[in-house]
Amino acid sequence: MDRKVAREFRHKVDFLIENDAEKDYLYDVLRMYHQTMDVAVLVGDLKLVINEPSRLPLFDAIRPLIPLKHQVEYDQLTPRRSRKLKEVRLDRLHPEGLGLSVRGGLEFGCGLFISHLIKGGQADSVGLQVGDEIVRINGYSISSCTHEEVINLIRTKKTVSIKVRHIGLIPVKSSPDEPLTWQYVDQFVSESGGVRGSLGSPGNRENKEKKVFISLVGSRGLGCSISSGPIQKPGIFISHVKPGSLSAEVGLEIGDQIVEVNGVDFSNLDHKEAVNVLKSSRSLTISIVAAAGRELFMTDRERLAEARQRELQRQELLMQKRLAMESNKILQEQQEMERQRRKEIAQKAAEENERYRKEMEQIVEEEEKFKKQWEEDWGSKEQLLLPKTITAEVHPVPLRKPKYDQGVEPELEPADDLDGGTEEQGEQDFRKYEEGFDPYSMFTPEQIMGKDVRLLRIKKEGSLDLALEGGVDSPIGKVVVSAVYERGAAERHGGIVKGDEIMAINGKIVTDYTLAEAEAALQKAWNQGGDWIDLVVAVCPPKEYDDELTFF
């Protein structure tokens, strides 16, 4: 690096950055760039320290440190500040308004900046950009105006004259108490929620403008020739580039227009003055507009080839347009078919839901009727529950010949009979359940709470003949078996008895069901297809023998 360039760079860094830590960070970033040669990472890192408008000149100061092969890419990634003010006129009475939003003002300690543009609106159409600083409105400087004063100034005339310069940064400060910070426009989310780019609309001149730095120290020259444009297209243009020269290495091409060199505007310079400026320094910062005068240096053959190429491109675009229209038509047809299909599915689903609702209402109604009848006939159902035990109590085996010590003998004979009853009861208590069932695969430890949870598979033959009671909203707090009727499928299975808790029906957990919901679910599961019904029950714990004794 040229010592003079390095000295000027350090002087500018010391002038613009006061914080020593930020200075060290800047130098570290530059050292890492020269190791990795990743321009995009460099610019992203630089934006963390070049984070306010006053520091933007550092991007130009760093430009001489960038190799020639990266000059154009570096220029495209860094914010492009305006060289001069731009003036536009907007109609305040336009039906869609001015088409822009602004933020900032004296009370925020900064100027007024455009923060949002309505796409296709007035401001967008005249070339204003997000990140433009408004300098004058209707001829008045607004540097000492508050936000409200600026708004009032805009309302004074029907036609609003606005002068702006592009900065590429947006002030961020929600209230006067918060510190002022800045965001680059390519990182700023506007009020509409979209991220706006720091460059202007596609196709404008600034998109083709680029800035390069060339040091002539130790070289024979730029390696290019310049020419003045004709009357209808004035300006200074590159007419020849020597292969392998500095100009070729930095990316200059025939037809590029030179618009500025070292801060000197080339718009109105003649050929001799332009040559003198280019030869006046060994370090040149050149701003050009790519291919602005390319047609001035084309041969007839090149013009013919370009016209032919343009026609081919036009035909290709027409073909793409036709294909797009056909694809769009097909897409619309597919979308319409999909819409109709979804409509039919929704209609069928609604019909199915209505049918299911009516079925459920009918089931609940039948269950309520059945429950009422069952409650009226409760006593007889209790007799059906334990018929064998009752028989043992009502019809004991006749006693043998009475004896004086019949206090012992009468008890022995019925005891034999009761033993038989006990054997039968023991057969009823034998539970048939599915081996290998893991209750923790269906229920939480809190739901199980040490219960003996079993999976029963009952064959659907005849009626289930199983009655329930309780429910989540009852004092019991759960759904339990209140009766198992004789000759029903539940009784034939032998794995469920009165007092067992019903925890799941055909894989559906019912621990939080009301009685009506549980009965409806049980009825539906029984009436559905299939030969079996799966019930998960928590076995009723056995009662203590003392609970069954009555003392007189």
Swiss-Prot record:
Residues 401-427 are annotated as: Disordered. Keywords: Cell projection, Coiled coil, Cytoplasm, Cytoskeleton, Deafness, Differentiation, Hearing, Non-syndromic deafness, Phosphoprotein, Repeat, Retinitis pigmentosa, Usher syndrome. SMART domains: PDZ (SM00228). GO terms for biological process: actin filament bundle assembly; auditory receptor cell morphogenesis; brush border assembly; equilibrioception; G2/M transition of mitotic cell cycle; inner ear auditory receptor cell differentiation; inner ear morphogenesis; inner ear receptor cell stereocilium organization. It is found in: Cytoplasm, Cytosol; Cytoplasm, Cytoskeleton; Cell projection, Microvillus. One of its GO terms (molecular function) is spectrin binding. Expressed in small intestine, colon, kidney, eye and weakly in pancreas. Expressed also in vestibule of the inner ear. Residues 194-552 are annotated as: Mediates interaction with MYO7B. Residues 1-86 are annotated as: N-terminal domain. One of its GO terms (cellular component) is cilium. Its main location: cytoplasm. The modification Phosphoserine is found at S219. It is linked to Usher syndrome 1C: USH is a genetically heterogeneous condition characterized by the association of retinitis pigmentosa with sensorineural deafness. Age at onset and differences in auditory and vestibular function distinguish Usher syndrome type 1 (USH1), Usher syndrome type 2 (USH2) and Usher syndrome type 3 (USH3). USH1 is characterized by profound congenital sensorineural deafness, absent vestibular function and prepubertal onset of progressive retinitis pigmentosa leading to blindness. Part of the IMAC/intermicrovillar adhesion complex/intermicrovillar tip-link complex composed of ANKS4B, MYO7B, USH1C, CDHR2 and CDHR5. Part of a complex composed of USH1C, USH1G and MYO7A. Interacts with F-actin. Interacts with USH2A. Interacts with SLC4A7. Interacts (via PDZ1 domain) with the C-terminus of USHBP1. Interacts (via N-terminus and PDZ 2 domain) with CDH23. Interacts with USH1G. Interacts with MYO7B. Interacts with CDHR2 and CDHR5; may mediate their interaction with MYO7B at the microvilli tip. Interacts (via PDZ 1 domain) with ANKS4B. Interacts (via PDZ 1 domain) with DOCK4. The PDZ 1 domain mediates interaction with ANKS4B, DOCK4, USHBP1, USH1G, SLC4A7. The N-terminal region constitutes an independently folded domain that has structural similarity with the CCM2 C-terminus, despite very low sequence similarity. Anchoring/scaffolding protein that is a part of the functional network formed by USH1C, USH1G, CDH23 and MYO7A that mediates mechanotransduction in cochlear hair cells. Required for normal development and maintenance of cochlear hair cell bundles. As part of the intermicrovillar adhesion complex/IMAC plays a role in brush border differentiation, controlling microvilli organization and length. Probably plays a central regulatory role in the assembly of the complex, recruiting CDHR2, CDHR5 and MYO7B to the microvilli tips. This is Harmonin. It comes from Homo sapiens (Human). The gene is USH1C.
